[in-house]
Amino acid sequence: MRARMALYHSKINYEHREILLRNRPEKLYQLSPKGTVPVLELPSGDVIDESFDIMKWALSINDPEMWFDKHKEEQVDLIKLNDDKFKKWLDKYKYHVRFPEYPLEYYRKECEKILDIYEDRLKDKSFFFGATISLADIAVMPFI
């Protein structure tokens, strides 16, 4: 979702293909051996297979509302917190039967610790970095 939002925002034309993860086409593995989505094949033949990297690439082409113009380092740090920690705990919470090492409540509390960080950033403003939307807002939003 977040990669598509950045591509749309940047007004980049691309061919969108929905993939059933239980029936992944061979072409997906040819482009990216990981077999994960999203995958963006550039006109040059280069492939970007991480959503955050697709977002950064799209905004490097066209960033009309300057989502990634200010607070770049802080935005990257917040997105890394989301991608490296929050997503991990969220998956363990959602699929807790696969992770019996801890009770469900433990995973929930780990998620809440990170949500508290987000909440603190938003307590006196509409977006993570002020009055206007940023790349970090778009990158984190699909997971909340």
Identify the meaning behind each predicted range.
Residues 130-144:
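GST superfamily/GST-like fold recognition
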Residues 81, 117, 142-144:
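Alpha-helical scaffold segments in carbohydrate-active enzymes
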Residues 120-131:
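Surface-exposed helix-capping loop/turn segments at secondary-structure junctions
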